[in-house]
Amino acid sequence: MCSSDLSNAIDPDRDVHLQTIPPAQMLADLKDGSIDGYCIGDPWNFRAAREGHGFPIAGDLEIWSGHPGKVLGAREDWAIAYPNTHIALTKAVLEACRYCADPAHWDELSQLLSDRRYLGMKPELIRFGVTDANHDTSPAEPHTLFFGPGVNRPSRSEHLWILTQLARWSEIPFPRNYVEILERICAVGVYSTAARELGLDDVTYQRSGIELFDGVPFNADDPISYLNQLSIHKDFSVAEIPVGVPRALAS
């Protein structure tokens, strides 16, 4: 959000007021004028356009095509205590991703997600492909990449880029020991085992470099230089972040 603001000569600290509100509340706040806009994915942006309360300025694919979305996270002590369950859970998510990637299942998934327990909105507002907000044509191109070569594989380079952005806006000091931290939190080995057991052939797949709309190349080998070359950033610090030893799971 802050990076996209900067690309349009908007200083996110000076020119706008950013606040966090629940996704389900965003449309109501936009309708009554409590906010001027919001940054969110489907179905809330599509619904605003369909109901005439707003319009998308830019989509996420225009900002960072192929960007990471949701993650499956687990506490380290639990993962150590139950390694087989951790792998089985990862396999289940991979199989679910493969199911969601098939357009033949999109109508079923829209019906499921429309339930009050989940999104609580009309199924036709829940899309899985790239379409015009004013037309109901069947999408030929998926918007969300649920499954495919390297799509689900954890990427430490992407984790590292996110760390640089948190430091860029002074949310955290940039960790001097970022390699150690990424090795602890990005469980590539668990994914590799799960993928291998499912017969997937993308265990060793390597993603291409991170390419954002601003055209500034991200050098994962020198994140500090990357931060320093950004035209606007807050004063950031670099510090050793103690990570400690994995704690034992309480019995």
Task: For the regions a language model picked out, list residue spans one by one.
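Short, small-residue-biased leader/transition segments that mark boundaries at the very start
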Residues: 1-3
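Short helix-initiation/N-cap motifs at beta->coil->alpha
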Residues: 11-32, 43
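Short beta-strand->loop
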Residues: 16, 54-67
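A ligand-binding cleft/hinge motif common to bilobed small-molecule-binding domains
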Residues: 35-54
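A bilobed periplasmic-binding-protein/Venus flytrap-type ligand-binding module shared by bacterial periplasmic
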Residues: 68-85, 99
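Secondary-structure end/capping motifs
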Residues: 82-186
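Conserved C-terminal helix/tail region of periplasmic/extracytoplasmic solute-binding proteins
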Residues: 160-251
